[in-house]
Amino acid sequence: MQHAASAIIAPEVGFLPAYWQFHEEVTRAQLRAWLPTGRHTLVDVSGPRGPGAELAAEAGHTVLRVIDGVPPGRGLEDPSSDGGSLNGRGLDGRGLEDRGSDGRGELDGSTRRDRHGQIIRLVADSSRLQFLNDGCADAVIAEDRALSVHLAAEILIAEIARVLRPAGRVLACVDSLVLGMAVLADQHHWAHLVDVPHAEVVLVPWPDGSITRCYGPDQVRELFSGAGLTVKWIRPRTVFSESMVTHCLQREPDSLPKLVRAELAAAADESLGAQLVISASKPRTRPH
């Protein structure tokens, strides 16, 4: 029997089924549409499947990709002598702070240059960004369930707000209450299911033994506003059902681009869908 959690996790296979090809293309299209114009400094704290760093670098941005992990007890290092932008003091001379030998983060030695931008990878605790200076990022990407996997999301969102410059933006994707309730129903946790509408924080056990934090629109707004961020919009990652997408692609295998455009143009209740995508910004500094 297919578990409800499979609605947001692509199968580990060499060739993605039709629906997951659609899901991936929608994710990429939403990210491309959100990315700022020009060249900027971005921080990506997304989960491992998030394509944000790759797409941002292709668009000309410099991206610090924070890879979640517990680094050895060494400080930040110069990544290499290949022209990477880290010099021990900053991301492009301004963003990444050397915290000494306290083990806050470790460069993994890789600086990937795209045709226009670059990705600098750092192994660190992505929920605590002490290695970044205040206001160093023009935008932050927290895709691939970052604020659901980190259960103490208040810590992560506060760190995101701190590193954003005034008027900087954040794009995030979280697991929704709709998904959480479906997972609880699959597991026959009826008592917990009854409590979901009244709970301030909804933590749902996952089939693999992990726990995810699920959100409704009101909880998303409360989380972001608590960190001083203003939510601009909330929308489902996808509105179209897996059965509908699969049926359409079986009938017309070349209709994927058309389906993606239709998905992006579709009006949707912000509480629908297995995942919610959020765009928010940090207020501009008021003149004294």
Regions found by a protein language model. Give the residues of each.
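Class I SAM-dependent methyltransferase SAM/SAH-binding core
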Residues: V43, P48-D78, G103-L129
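A short acidic, Gly/Pro-enriched loop at the edge of an enzyme's catalytic core
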Residues: Q130-V140
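Acceptor-substrate binding/catalytic loop of class I
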Residues: L203-Q219
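A short glycine-rich, Lys/Arg-flanked "PGG" loop and its adjoining helix->strand segment in the class I
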Residues: E154-R169
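A C-terminal cap/extension of S-adenosyl-L-methionine-dependent methyltransferases
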Residues: R221-S225, W233-H288
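Conserved class I S-adenosyl-L-methionine
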Residues: M1-T41, P51-L55, R169-E200, V245, V260
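A short SAM/SAH-binding and catalytic strip from SAM-dependent methyltransferases
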Residues: D138-A153
